[in-house]
Structures are given as C-alpha cells and as structure tokens.
C-alpha cells in the first residue's frame, strides 16, 4: 500500500514537470502608468506569479488556463526596448515569453497655442512628464524649451520666446526614458502685431514702433511701396518691438504691412481679437503765408516735406504740368507761367493721401518798361508779365479812363492806344479776381507806373493810327474814344504861303483892269 502512494506522488511530480506554462502573446503597457497587461498562453493554473523585465506584475487575475491579467506600473529602461515575461505556476517558470513585452510609445494627438505657449496632448505618455524637451525651429532660429511648471499629464506646455517667428514650425519632442523623438511640422501661431504707434504723424522723420509677438530676430515693414528691411527685433520678455523711421516724402498708399524674419506675413488684431488691415495718416500740412515775388510765388508752409510731386497748382479749370517747384520743408517756391487764364490762382497742397489744403493768390501784374508815347497820339507798349488779361487805365488830374489794349498770348506785353498830349501820364494795370472788371468786385491786384509824352514832336513823330486790338479783354467800362488819324493830322507840307511881292502884283493887275 505504501509503495502505491509513493508511485502516485512520483507520477504527479513527473507530470508537473512536463506541464510548465507557455506564453504566446503579451499586450503592451504604458510607461509609468498602472496598466493591466493581458498574457495569453497555456497552463495558467493555481496561483501564478508574473514578472516583466524582472519587475513584479501584480495583482494577477486568472481568467482561465489560457489567459490571465496583471497590473504593471514599473518604468523599465530604456522604454523603447523589449522585455521578458515569466509566469510561474507551482514554481515552474513559463516558456515562450522572451521579449514579448514592450511599452506603447507616446504619441501626440493635439498641438495648440495657449497664451504664448505651445500646448501638446500626449497619448500613452508617462505620468512623469518633467523630462520632456521641445526643440522649436522656424527655419532660421531655434530654441530648446522645457516643460512649464503647470503641465500635468497628458497635457504639456512649452513657453515660446518672441525670437521664434510665427508660421510653420519644425517641432522635435524629445522624450525621456529612451523613447524616440517625435518630429512634426505645424503652424501653431502667426507673427502678430498688437499695436503700432503712432499711426498719424508729420511728414518729418518719425520713429514708429511696431509691437507684437513672434517676429523672430529681424523684421521688415512696408509703408506704401517703400520697404524697411533688416529691422532688429527687441524682446522685453513679454512682447517684441520693431522701430523704424519714416521718410519725409509721401508714400504711395496709407497701408502698412510687415513680415517676420522668415518672410511670414504678420497679422494685426484689434482689441476684440479680430484681424484688421493697418492704415496710417499724415497730419495735414499748413500754409502760413503766400507771397508773390516777380514771376514766382513763395508759400510758407509746415509739414509738407520735400516731396513736391504732391503739390499742384490750379489756375481756373486748368492745372499746368510744367511747373518749376523748389524749396524746403518750410518754404515752397513755384515759378508761374507768364500768361494766366485767371487773375486768382489756387494752390493745392496734398499731404500724400490726406485731405488737400488750399490757398489762393491774386497775381499782381508786373511792369518792366513802357515805351514813350508819340506827342501827337498813337500807341505805347507795356512790357512785363501777367499782362495777357490785365485791365489798363490812365489817370489824368485824378480822372481815370479805361483803355482797350491788345495783349500778346505770352502775357509779356500789351499795346495800348494813347491820345495826343504832353507830360507824364499815370498808368494803372490791374488784375481782377476771375478777371472781372465789375466795379462791385473789390478783389483786385494793381500795379502803377507812368509814361511820358514829349512837349514837341520828334523828327519822326507823325500821326500813327491806333492799333487794332488782336485780342479783346473781358468787358470793362467803355473806354474814352481816342483821336482819329484825321483829327490829329498835322498840316500838309504841300501848303504854299503868299509872299508880299505876290500881293503887290495882284494889286497892280486889279488897278489896270479898272
């Protein structure tokens, strides 16, 4: 009987030795995160003991002889390796579990901006995320960033410096514990302008500051068609700033655009966070005085710069295109054509894209010379400028008489009829506003001079018919008629005087007839 019991015990021992558990599959774990691992195989009986990579996987839940689960939270290194799994049943270790366990590598599910930071959500990441690093590269500048203190798995944050330009970024998430680097490219945020000051300025060089985020290390700004390049970005830790100095000329448009160091367009957000275009204005110019100097006009101004292409001159309905304009930021000199379509001219000072500032000037005729008048009447020639539509009158004994003259088209001379006489005659030449001679219109610009009539005729002083005007001035009071050639004709040189001898002959002949 005892011999039979010994045989049974030996049989069980031998049978157990031949029934060691086997492992055919093992599910992945999450690094540093308690995870139930499923082990598939055979011979999972009794109370198995499971180890993974030498670390206990516990507690063990046996579903059946072919499957069990155990909870595993150890952090095996390096995390990207394969580890052995052993299941012991009755002290007998399993077979087939070599290298079947590995961690599921962490992946990124979301990348998003967060108040100046790049936020990332890890899938299957470790509970301890403090060792993560992020290498950010904008194709020109790069920075190695650490996880911020408020990061909590699975969400991690990296604070991005303003020296990184917004736009498409190359992101390298460097993982600890031996996991591979995660590389991706994403446009997380744009270079953003929060303010530009000032946006209204004079036409003198003015420092303008552009403030925002993610400009990179250099930036460029375009005003109208002019580009300011290579501007250094100043980073105060919260915002970045770019300063450029405007030109003293009017730009072609009132828009401002800017690019980060990578060439990415900056966007401008208003106080509500809405994207808006950027526009600026010039402070309007001022005209302090206008003065005529011979054939030029001196306009004293402020805030006009040196870009005289924006200055125009209106004369009546026309705007001459061949004006000679010179000057400085405080004084503009315009040389006028000598013939004017109207007496009053208007200047338009345009501050680029700003409103036009205007000023008017009634041009005074300029007399350079007057020819001497014939003693017996005839014509005189007045030479000067701005005479093409001037009104001419003579003043004798405080009596004023308008005369109709013939101007040339160049505005440089007038031929006027004059009566016979002698002495010095006052001559008045006037430009009226709009060249109107209506006496009720008080706006006028007058210049005076004199001409002389000799007391006796000169050897060549013969009666000269008054010229027929080739051009009629605007209506004026009916001029006092001048003498006709017949009325002023001198005695004919053919008239014969009767001598005393002839008178005696005539007397004797008369006596003889009686």
UniProtKB/Swiss-Prot annotation:
Sequence repeats: 462-469, 472-479
Transmembrane residue ranges: none
KW Cytoplasm (keyword) present: no
Post-translational modification: Phosphorylated on serine and N-glycosylated with two types of oligosaccharide chains. The GPI-like-anchor contains a phosphoceramide group, rather than a phosphatidyl group.
Gene3D superfamilies the UniProt entry points to: Immunoglobulins
SUPFAM superfamilies named in the record: E set domains
Subcellular location: Cell membrane
Residue ranges, annotated region (Globular): 20-453
Domain notes: The C-terminal region contains clusters of proline regularly alternating with a hydroxyamino acid. This domain might act as a spacer to elevate sites active in cell contact into the extracellular space.
Its biological purpose: This cell-surface glycoprotein mediates cell-cell binding via homophilic interaction.
Name used for this protein in its record: Contact site A protein
Lineage: Eukaryota, Amoebozoa, Evosea, Eumycetozoa, Dictyostelia
Gene: csaA
